[in-house]
């Protein structure tokens, strides 16, 4: 990998940066469709300039936090959902690297990408509990709309640099959509 300019204009070597530990959540309804939200783009963030803005909930793991607890916290903070039951936890962590033009800028300039632990949940509640804009608890909205999507469609709806992650997640949880 080559070096790129960070937020201060200094050169950043992506390999010198760690991966941010995160969780990702595939939430399936009773029909086997997956919840996806359309990201609100913030200038300079990892979605800036993207046209494929649909994604599943995801977020950082706080220091000392268990990934399973982080998953439920992130799900609530981003969607308001609490009526879920765990279906499966992916056995492996999945990494992605930011594209070169975002290294040193996105993810607060501190990370080269993310390493994600994925969980699949079944949504057991009423859709009226889903609240994205604004989400509950005074959290900043990340999505401007949401839909239930066929699982197989997800890799083509996400920003291209996360596509391989979504392909792996779909392969891992495909049997849950049946």
Curated annotation (Swiss-Prot):
Disulfide bonds: none annotated. Its cofactor is a divalent metal cation. CDD domains: NUDIX_Ap4A_hydrolase_plant_like. A motif (Nudix box) lies at residues 59-80. GO terms for molecular function: bis(5'-adenosyl)-pentaphosphatase activity; guanosine-3',5'-bis(diphosphate) 3'-diphosphatase activity. PROSITE patterns: NUDIX, NUDIX_BOX. One of its GO terms (biological process) is ribose phosphate metabolic process. Keywords: Hydrolase. It comes from the Bacteria. Belongs to the Nudix hydrolase family. RppH subfamily. HAMAP family: Nudix_RppH. This is RNA pyrophosphohydrolase. It comes from Brucella canis (strain ATCC 23365 / NCTC 10854 / RM-666). The lineage of its organism: Bacteria, Pseudomonadati, Pseudomonadota, Alphaproteobacteria, Hyphomicrobiales.
């Amino acid at each position: 990998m080559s070096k790129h300019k960070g937020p201060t204009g200094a050169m950043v070597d992506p390999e010198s940066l760690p991966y941010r530990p995160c969780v990702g959540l595939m939430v399936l309804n009773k029909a086997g469709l997956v919840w996806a939200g359309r990201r609100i783009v913030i200038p300079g963030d990892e979605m800036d300039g993207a046209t494929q803005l649909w994604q599943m909930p995801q977020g950082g793991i706080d220091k000392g936090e268990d990934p399973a607890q982080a998953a439920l916290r992130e799900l609530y903070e981003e969607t308001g959902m609490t009526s879920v039951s765990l279906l499966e936890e992916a056995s492996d962590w999945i990494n992605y690297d930011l594209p070169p033009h975002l290294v040193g800028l996105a993810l607060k300039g501190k990370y080269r990408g993310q390493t994600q632990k994925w969980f699949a949940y079944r949504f057991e509640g009423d859709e009226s509990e889903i609240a994205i804009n604004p989400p509950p608890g005074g959290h900043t909205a990340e999505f401007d709309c949401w839909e239930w999507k066929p699982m197989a469609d997800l890799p083509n709806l996400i920003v291209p640099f996360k596509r391989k992650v979504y392909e792996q997640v779909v392969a891992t949880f495909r049997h849950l959509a049946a």
